[in-house]
Amino acid sequence: MKVMQQTTHRTYPIRVAQVIGKAVISGVDSVVMNYYRHIDRSRIQFDFFMDGYNKTLIDEEILDLGGRIIKLEPYEASMRINMRQCRAAFTEGQYTIVHSHLNTLSCFPLYAALQAKVPIRIAHSHSTTSRGEWKRNLMKQALRPFSKTFATHYAACADYTARWLFGSKTIQKGQVRLIKNAVDTTLFSPNEKARERIRKEFGLENRFIVGHIGRFAFQKNHELLVRVFAEVYRQNPNAALILIGTGELETDIRSLVKELDIEKVVFFTGIRRDIPDFLNAFDVFFLPSRYEGMPVVGIEAQAVGLPCLMSDTVTKDTAITPLVEFFPLHASIPEWTQKLLSYEHARKRPYPELVRDSGFDIHHAAEDLCRWYESLFASLQKI
């Protein structure tokens, strides 16, 4: 696909190549889209570099907002082809800024950007690692030393993720830009009508609803989530579980739900666009992840006033309100069960001022990002 050309002369909008990998409508791509919707697009435009050739749920919105989409060969299929396509698109578009969100894998598109003579190359850390995911960890550890090699600038969603990828010294030198996983506090807010609508849609009007939003992947720990819920249901037949998302382990989790004989009270929704409504419908957001950077859905949940139970491996920076409680990942299933049961009558309370004051309001955060890109672009004219 042809990409709009751009030079280092001051022209607007400045087009930034956003390398997001797979678009799965959660996590990284959700964060980038939140910024894209709220950034001043007369000054900054995003072009999205995605792995895979299939149409995604965000394609149409990107095009409507003036962005461009460059589909790439998935790196799992051929890293060589993926990098060649990146290099060609970076060159054709004459980008001045490439912003890669692939954590340790950012070294590959940023090397392609270096070859294409892109002057500003941003490596962005969104996550960390887990002891149990040993095969992927080997690759992450092997690539981590190269995370800074081809980047000119560093960004992270939290100090924790910055330290993991770039090291403490880089943070101490003030070289890492903190870009928070900000949310739209006008969209993610208490909504009783939305709560009633979702509960009626699933026939759960008077039930204790445990909710989870995330990819069906090793990181998210769905097996523990489902086993804990099965015990919750046995002790409280009024409980129900809603799982939003898709992923490579979905079939396995469906089989586990069947094995545990809880199919009637576990609902798989696939990908949904009405996330604010679901968060309003839940009684508790359950996130027993093996590891997390800064889960944007955790910020969204707090914005609507939803109590959150998370594993203690989730970065503590996520707790921007008193709504978040961390629990030991390796606690026993009975311990997890009793803790989750305690949320049936937990009080919902929004803390909009805390979300805003913590820097997680997208309206302010998007303007900060816009100014940062402009300052990077302006610095080229001084060389």
What feature does the model see in each segment?
Residues 271, 290:
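Aromatic "clamp/platform" in nucleotide-sugar-dependent glycosyltransferases that forms part
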Residues 49-50, 307-311, 316:
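Short hydrophobic beta-strand element within catalytic cores of glycosyltransferases
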Residues 29-34, 208, 212-231, 248-254:
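A conserved mid-protein helix/loop that constitutes part of the nucleotide-sugar donor-binding site
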Residues 2-14, 18-82, 175, 248-250, ...:
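N-terminal strand-loop element at the rim of the active site
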Residues 150-189:
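A short, active-site helix/loop in glycosyltransferases that binds the activated sugar's phosphate group
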Residues 254-270:
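Nucleotide-activated donor-binding/catalytic signature segment of Leloir-type glycosyltransferases, i.e.
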Residues 100-106, 125:
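Short His-centered aromatic/hydrophobic patch
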